Amino acid sequence: MELKTEEEEVGGVQPVSIQAFASSSTLHGLAHIFSYERLSLKRALWALCFLGSLAVLLCVCTERVQYYFCYHHVTKLDEVAASQLTFPAVTLCNLNEFRFSQVSKNDLYHAGELLALLNNRYEIPDTQMADEKQLEILQDKANFRSFKPKPFNMREFYDRAGHDIRDMLLSCHFRGEACSAEDFKVVFTRYGKCYTFNSGQDGRPRLKTMKGGTGNGLEIMLDIQQDEYLPVWGETDETSFEAGIKVQIHSQDEPPFIDQLGFGVAPGFQTFVSCQEQRLIYLPSPWGTCNAVTMDSDFFDSYSITACRIDCETRYLVENCNCRMVHMPGDAPYCTPEQYKECADPALDFLVEKDQEYCVCEMPCNLTRYGKELSMVKIPSKASAKYLAKKFNKSEQYIGENILVLDIFFEVLNYETIEQKKAYEIAGLLGDIGGQMGLFIGASILTVLELFDYAYEVIKHRLCRRGKCQKEAKRNSADKGVALSLDDVKRHNPCESLRGHPAGMTYAANILPHHPARGTFEDFTC
């Protein structure tokens, strides 16, 4: 009987020799190194060239991998034409926070020192610097004899004493059609009571423009009311040395941050602001530093740098002063004038100017901003001064000192996309490595698989020869026994040799009644 030998069973088929594998391998040069010839100069040169190419390949691949993990990015700039564009939100603030005529005796009692109108003894600090008319009014309001102060609220004070858009707005047109003060939404900033045109809030649709150029945007004429400016006898955060308005052009998805991002418009000039919408797309870490997650805030739904800053400043003041400024969101109590002077203003100034670690606001991954180009002309001209003075029932001097015109429009009806892209992606890395492998050693991914497959067969065979596989196979054979093939059984059939045995060698019928008469051994084996 022919059985499989133990060597074949436990060790498997012996792998081909290294020479045979090299001759059939797709790796260039391997057949010349491991040839059947005796060691020669030719084989040594081939081995040297192969090792040199392999070393260069490893150096190049290492450099490519290191470059990939630097996570470089490039910036793509493109301009896209559009049939229409959403007009931006325009927020404007008078640089004077409170109208002098609206400051009551109770306001002066509580906030006079904050506004630098009174000293800590409730006295006018420097009467020589005051205008006679203003001084007379102020002296009357500052007489607190037998005065009983009433409750005071900073939010109510800002709302009541701030400049009213209905008094400031002399003319308004959007795309040639008349607009009014009703199209402006009240918003509080660090400049006090401000107004936003085209806010897109309170159910109002966002206005769109179909053309570029002047006359196709917002044109307003404003009276800044310098006669209502508070007299300046000292330097505080609530007093202003300038006259005019502060303007910020921004997306409807972000709150105004006008004290940091606004630009000034002076009276006596018509200011033209040519805009271009810019859509910026930044990459998240590790290619960039943008914030790809939603904002974790109780005050704002969408993330933006301005929303992050306002949220952070609010938390900072609540933690340090136990109150919030009027322009800050939340439900914490408003700061009193004393808290404004002693804590809130100094704390916020410190946070904005010096503390670079508390408020770290990352760039959002998608951002819309508006590039601006400003130009201006003098207004009124000598020819129009008398007409405007008559039209608004003011003097020519008042017109020159208080009237301004602001014209905001898109330069052209397109938008600019500024997009960060990965400079080197995984596909490029694999392509470079594959190209270098083909150039230096003529290999591919399948070639590498060939090498691993051959190495696996060799290692497996050697481990089995050491006896590990033999012990396992012996345990298996003890359980299963020896397997015989059908041919083996036929060749060793015991019945063949017993055919034709003597007839007398039979069993009695009563022993095996259902069996035919057979030979003694034939019956048991067959």
Swiss-Prot record:
Gene3D superfamilies: acid-sensing ion channel 1 domain, Acid-sensing ion channel domain, YojJ-like
Modulation of this protein's activity: Inhibited by the diuretic drug amiloride.
Glycosylation sites: N366, N393
Residues that bear Phosphoserine: S477, S497
Transmembrane segments: 50-66, 426-456
Catalytic reaction list: Na(+)(in) = Na(+)(out); Ca(2+)(in) = Ca(2+)(out)
Positions of the record's site feature: Involved in channel desensitization: E79
Parts of the chain on the Extracellular side: 67-425
Disulfide bond annotation, renumbered to this chain: C93-C194, C172-C179, C290-C365, C308-C361, C312-C359, C321-C343, C323-C335
Keywords attached to this entry: Calcium, Calcium transport, Cell membrane, Cell projection, Disulfide bond, Glycoprotein, Ion channel, Ion transport, Membrane, Phosphoprotein, Postsynaptic cell membrane, Sodium, Sodium channel, Sodium transport, Synapse, Transmembrane, Transmembrane helix, Transport
Stretches in topological domain Cytoplasmic: 1-49, 457-526
Tissues and organs where the protein is expressed, per its UniProt entry: Expressed in brain areas receiving strong excitatory corticofugal input. In hippocampus, expressed in the hilus of the dentate gyrus. In the cerebral cortex expressed in anterior and posterior cingulate cortex, sensory and motor cortices. In the sensory cortex strongest expression is detected in the whisker barrel field. In sensorimotor and cingulate cortex expression is elevated in layer III. Also expressed in basal ganglia, striatum, ventral pallidum, olfactory tubercle, and nucleus accumbens. Weakly expressed in thalamus with the exception of the habenula and the medial septal nuclei.
One cellular component (GO) term of this entry: synapse
PROSITE patterns attached to this UniProt entry: ASC
Effect of a null allele: Knockout mice lacking Asic1 display absence of acid-evoked currents in hippocampal neurons and impaired hippocampal long-term potentiation (LTP). An absence of acid-evoked currents in amygdala neurons and an alteration of amygdala-dependent behavior including deficits in cue and context fear conditioning are also observed. This is associated with altered spatial learning, memory capability and fear conditioning.
Subcellular location(s) per record: Cell membrane; Postsynaptic cell membrane; Cell projection, Dendrite
Motif GAS motif positions after renumbering to this chain: 442-444
GO biological process: associative learning; behavioral fear response; calcium ion transmembrane transport; cellular response to pH; establishment of localization in cell; inorganic cation transmembrane transport; memory; monoatomic cation transport
Membrane topology: Multi-pass membrane protein
GO molecular function: inorganic cation transmembrane transporter activity; ligand-gated sodium channel activity; monoatomic cation channel activity; monoatomic ion-gated channel activity; pH-gated monoatomic ion channel activity
Self-association state and partner proteins as the record states: Homotrimer. Heterotrimer; with other ASIC proteins producing channel with different properties. Interacts with PICK1; regulates ASIC1 clustering in membranes. Interacts with STOM; alters heterotrimeric ASIC channels activity.
UniProt free text on domains: The second transmembrane domain (TM2) is a discontinuous alpha-helix disrupted by the GAS motif, which forms the selectivity filter by adopting an extended, belt-like conformation aligned approximately parallel to the membrane plane. This peptide belt encircles the waist of the channel and divides TM2 into two discontinuous helical segments. The distal helical segment of TM2 interacts with the cytoplasmic portion of the first transmembrane domain (TM1) from a neighboring subunit, contributing to the structural and functional integrity of the channel.
Descriptive protein name: Acid-sensing ion channel 1
Organism: Mus musculus (Mouse)
Gene: Asic1
